[in-house]
Amino acid sequence: MTDTTRLFVTIAALAMTLAVVLGAFGAHALKARITPAQLGVWHTAVQYHLVHALGLFVVAALCHVWPGEAGVRLAGWMMAAGIVLFSGSLYVLVVTGV
């Protein structure tokens, strides 16, 4: 396994774990404290977070198949950035009530 493959597997596993934790947090701790519309936004954030974390596992597999392919690595970093920017902004939106 290459270092890049190992890196993306690690990032994907951490992202997947965080998505599950945040999904459970929204379903149990936030449910009574936020509006149904905000809960829907939270669920959207979790759904995109999970899908992109799964995509990072695919990127890790592709990095293993094509170890020197810069485009695959770029796709992985863009997916990771998408989790932080898109899902992260939705999480912040719900928590801050903006």
Model-identified regions with their sequence ranges:
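Polytopic transmembrane helical bundles with strong interfacial aromatic enrichment
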Residues: 1-98
